[in-house]
Amino acid sequence: MIKQYLQVTKPGIIFGNLISVIGGFLLASKGSIDYPLFLFTLVGVSLVVASGCVFNNYIDRDIDRKMERTKNRVLVKGLISPKMSLVYATLLGIAGFMLLWFGANPLAMWLAVMGFVVYVGVYSLYMKRHSVYGTLIGSLSGAAPPVIGYCAVTNEFDTGALILLAIFSLWQMPHSYAIAIFRFKDYQAANIPVLPVVKGISVAKNHITLYIIAFAVATLMLSLGGYAGYKYLVVAAAVSVWWLGMALRGYKAENDKVWARKLFVFSIVAITSLSVMMSVDFMVPDSHNLLTYVW
């Protein structure tokens, strides 16, 4: 039974979000780590993400039955009752929000609330099923964890937080479209209006390319703004160029499914690399940096 309650929280998604939380937290800490704050932030975000995932599993249990990838999920198979999943999700959420409020700061908690509401209330309940723009809206919730980590330290939403929001939101788009391409039949069967299904894979490839270019620009802003160093800059540039090259090769791909899966895998490598580099190659912002004038 414990295994089922763990599975319904989507541990893989929690782990991926924790990497970005750590990146944002350590970027803001700049070598001076408040370990109790670090622990409260990690556990708090983990619980909120887990809660969102359980609510998502509850909401999506009808369409999950139609998709090969999700047909064996805990709620679909009836291993946990829908009522118990709602209670479980609610308790996880309350615990997570309380930890962020008392262990971090109110700003971190409210950012978590906004991310949660967007993911569960806007994306899962409506946009995912009714709009081709669901992925775009959902990307905002996916970008919340690193911003929460950052603001847990700074206790303010500054330019650095805005750049992180842009980086991780833009990253979500090609990442999600790649999944939709190599899982095309699943989304089609479940009648989910993702871009590749609604507009076609060729249109999705154009969007992927444009979003990766925008992502590349956003990643450089951390260094240009004086938040991250040149080692981060080199890695960010290299990762972006390689990812863009993979996207461009998609126009000549003989097998879109294989190409999209490779693009998806590298997207994880890309965002993990950036999270690690911003954790170790941070800088104290100069009051006369470039973004002072831009923003």
From Swiss-Prot:
Documented EC number(s): 2.5.1.141
Domain of life: Bacteria
One Pfam assignment: UbiA
Intracellular or extracellular location(s): Cell inner membrane
UniProtKB keywords: Cell inner membrane, Cell membrane, Heme biosynthesis, Membrane, Transferase, Transmembrane, Transmembrane helix
Major subcellular site: membrane
Membrane topology note: Multi-pass membrane protein
Catalytic activity field: heme b + (2E,6E)-farnesyl diphosphate + H2O = Fe(II)-heme o + diphosphate
Gene Ontology molecular-function annotations: protoheme IX farnesyltransferase activity
Gene3D superfamilies, per database record: UbiA prenyltransferase
Pathway in which the depicted protein is active: Porphyrin-containing compound metabolism; heme O biosynthesis; heme O from protoheme: step 1/1
Record field: transmembrane: 8-28, 35-55, 74-94, 106-125, 132-152, 162-182, 208-228, 233-253, 264-284
GO biological process, one term: heme O biosynthetic process
GO CC annotation, single: plasma membrane
InterPro entries: Protohaem_IX_farnesylTrfase, UbiA_prenyltransferase, UbiA_prenylTrfase_CS, UbiA_sf
Role: Converts heme B (protoheme IX) to heme O by substitution of the vinyl group on carbon 2 of heme B porphyrin ring with a hydroxyethyl farnesyl side group.
Other notes: Carbon 2 of the heme B porphyrin ring is defined according to the Fischer nomenclature.
Family: Belongs to the UbiA prenyltransferase family. Protoheme IX farnesyltransferase subfamily.
Protein name as catalogued: Protoheme IX farnesyltransferase
